[in-house]
Amino acid sequence: MGMETLRNRLKELRARHDLTQEQLAQAVGVTRQTILSIERGNYSPSVLLALSIARVLEVPLEEAFWLEAENGRQEGE
């Protein structure tokens, strides 16, 4: 197994729900800076936080977060 990176589409999903970073942060109990860092890929959330975010955004975990291999392919392709 090669190097993998956790990717996300939080910004897109927040827009669908008309949520700001601050509103999502409050809903899951973190700071706006934490949401910003997750969106930018600078911080990988705990499983508990990722599940909480997915629940608030009303999507399966895999729709909000996924692993991407070093070669750019999504895990499982």
Features from the language model and the residues they span:
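Short alpha-helical DNA-recognition segment
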Residues: 18-37
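Short, charged recognition helix plus adjacent turn
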Residues: 65-77
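Alpha-helical residues within the helix-turn-helix
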Residues: 15, 26, 55
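Residue-level signal for the short linker/turn that defines the boundary of a DNA-recognition helix
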Residues: 8, 18-19, 45-48
